[in-house]
Structures are given as C-alpha cells and as structure tokens.
Amino acid sequence: MSLTASEKQVLMSEYQVHETDTGSADLQVAILTKRITQLTDHLKQNPKDHASRRGLLKMIGRRRRLLGYINKKDSNRYQTLIKRLGIRR
C-alpha cells in the first residue's frame, strides 16, 4: 500500500526542483498524490476499511495545504504542477 523506494526515486527524478531536492513542496505533493491514488484503489476494493479511509482524508488535507502554499508562493508553478499530476482543483 505504501510506495516502494524505487517508485519514490522515479517520482523524485521527475519532480525535483534541484539535484539534491528531497523534500520540496512540489515533490511532497507528487508523492502524496501517488499514495492517494493507491489508497483510493484499495478503498474501492475494501469499502469497509475505515482506518484507511481516515488516513486517506488526512493525506488529502495535507496535499491541499501544500498546494495552497505553492499557489500562494508561485501561482504559475502551481498551475503547471496540477496539470502534470492531473489533479482537478
């Protein structure tokens, strides 16, 4: 259910702001989006898993706050990020 190290490395190579970037807001949003997608698929198969649903809602809230921060700092970067990730907002 969680991301493997290789999946994280692929996301890091795609969304890094600079070469040694491991925790920028863009990268955090990309990782959260991948985890949210996986958890959504899990919940479609297991609708009574309420603990996972709560975790999903927490992740969605964290991603929303990070996206708000990015939008406040640089709206052009925000627009390109949500297009690249395929997020509707």
UniProtKB/Swiss-Prot annotation:
Pfam families: Ribosomal_S15 (PF00312)
Record keywords, A-Z: Ribonucleoprotein, Ribosomal protein, RNA-binding, rRNA-binding
Cited SMART domains: Ribosomal_S15
A cellular component term, taken from the record's GO annotations: cytosolic small ribosomal subunit
Single Gene Ontology BP annotation: translation
PROSITE patterns according to UniProt: RIBOSOMAL_S15
Molecular functions per Gene Ontology: rRNA binding; structural constituent of ribosome
Annotated PANTHER family: RIBOSOMAL PROTEIN S15, BACTERIAL AND ORGANELLAR, SMALL RIBOSOMAL SUBUNIT PROTEIN US15M
Identification of the protein by name: Small ribosomal subunit protein uS15
Organism (species): Crocosphaera subtropica (strain ATCC 51142 / BH68)
